[in-house]
Amino acid sequence: MPGRIVILGIFVADTAFRADRAPRPGETLIGNSFAQSPGGKGSNQAVAAARLGADVTLISKLGRDAFAMLARKTWTAAGVTARVVERADGATGAAFILVEEGSAENAIVLFPGAGATITPADVEAEAATIKTATVFMTQLEQPLAAAASGLEIARAAGVQTILNPAPA
């Protein structure tokens, strides 16, 4: 796969619970299963593209915690180059996902953690990385101003851009 993909996005640790139904306010419900896995739209896109053989760089922010270690392990295993700022004063993102067994409907609570602190200045610090890309991708899990900054840098350099408006 020729070219290089640069992705601006966040990592979250997905914590997924399956239950027959959603609990009511104030109720504790016994679930059927639990799984923890790497998540975050940008991180997932980077991992998927790298597994398909692409040269991928991910620009993101993490806390300094166990979820950050999961992120780095995931990216290393997939072959993703990480351009990441670690914040000692913030947590890595996490998502609570509840899946109802019968309907397979889900409800998600997302805490973007350190990913919510990505600024245009953080993105501008990676301008040289973005300008070397064939494709620049981003989503809207990190702040809109950061995504806009990345898109502007990429377009000015003639890099093809992709905006996934998720999680909208």
Where in this protein do the model-derived segments appear?
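Short, basic and Ser/Thr-rich N-terminal targeting/leader segments
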Residues: 52, 78, 90-93
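Short beta-strand scaffold segments in enzyme catalytic cores
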Residues: 47, 94-98, 107
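Glycine-rich phosphate/adenosyl-contacting loop at the front of the ribokinase-like
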Residues: 1-61, 68-70, 76
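Thr-Gly-centered strand-to-loop micro-motif
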Residues: 31-32, 39, 61, 94, ...
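Ribokinase/PfkB-type carbohydrate-kinase core domain
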Residues: 1-11, 57, 72-87, 99-168
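Short beta->alpha junction loops/turns
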Residues: 61-64, 143
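Residues at secondary-structure transition points
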Residues: 29-44, 66, 87-91, 113, ...
